Amino acid sequence: LHIVVPAIHRNRHEIGQIFKDKLGAKLENDEPESLNAIARDHLRKDFEGLKLGLSGVNFAMSREGAFWLIENEGNGRMCTTAPDIHIALCGVEKVMESFEDAATMVSLLTPSATGQFIPTYNNIITGPRKNGDLDGPKEVHVILFDHNRTKMLAHKDYYEALRCIRCGACMNFCPVYDQIGGHAYQTTYPGPIGEVISPNIFGIDHTGDILNFCSLCGRCSEVCPVQIPLADLIRKLRCDKIGQGENPPMGAKNIHHNAMEAFAFKQFKKAATKGERWRFALSKAHYFNWFVQNLSGALPVIKKWYAFKELPQIKKDLYKEIQAIEGVIYE
């Protein structure tokens, strides 16, 4: 799952098999040109019979009363011109003052998303077809939705995330997203930007767990074309999640208390602040291998997680290896 390339997690062989199973397509080969031809023929027939087309909006221009759709495939143009009714869904943060402002954003979006200078298709829609027009919808409706975006705008920190132009650059450079993919986030917006937007839009209680995905390496902040400090915002959201935002870190009534997490950190603190305890913990860490292998399936806390993941084995001589590392001062 990727906001620019939704099928990036599939290769051409898998896509060919999906076309064969779902569309009944006869595949001579699974070359990209052949797959594109199948998709084009199938979708065109669907578009010709549609009465209503639903699209998103890249940028809306209030002065001109128009909105801008960017694409490379052509399906967006079919969706907005072939049906009699076109409904465009637009987040309030995508509204610009003028065409010039939107053009500046487009000049950032396309190179950051796909490396192109300009997209293949630029659709600037000003309304339904006029008298004498041969094509286009008879009705155009624009729905502006908020979904807590105005609350983000009023926040002293999180308003910066509303600058996002949905280029996906932060995902392309995120080492965590590269390993787990977009579906692991289980939200509309994956990757670093999703870790900021999703808790604000859908609620930190519902999507706050994805904040733990971030390694805080900061690569996303470096490549963002609109300079959103993503790593800093993720860190602030983590503080909010555990009740340490604007509230006292100790004794705050709204702390999302997790007894097991609190116990684990308490034990870690005991070991990490005493040299002899820390050395003892490292020397016995390999016993954890037996615990994982024999008890992981029985403990409901980690049963589901371990069904899809496999922990690396801890070496028996880990303590000695750490001592032997050059430059490490071990007290």
Question: Which residue stretches match the model-derived regions?
Answer:
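Acidic/polar loop patches that form or flank catalytic/metal-binding clefts of enzymes
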Residues: 97-100, 111-118, 172, 179, ...
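Short linear elements at protein peripheries
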Residues: 285-331
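Phosphate-binding glycine-rich loops and their immediate beta-loop-alpha structural context
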Residues: 164, 168-171
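Amphipathic alpha-helical surface "interface" segments used
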Residues: 40, 123-130, 266-270, 305-309
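Ferredoxin-type iron-sulfur electron-transfer modules in oxidoreductases and energy-metabolism complexes
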Residues: 132-161, 176-296
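Short alpha-helical basic/polar micro-motif
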Residues: 63, 172, 222
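Short coil/turn segments at secondary-structure boundaries
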Residues: 117-121, 249-252, 296-301
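The feature marks the mature, well-folded catalytic cores of soluble enzymes
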Residues: 1-157
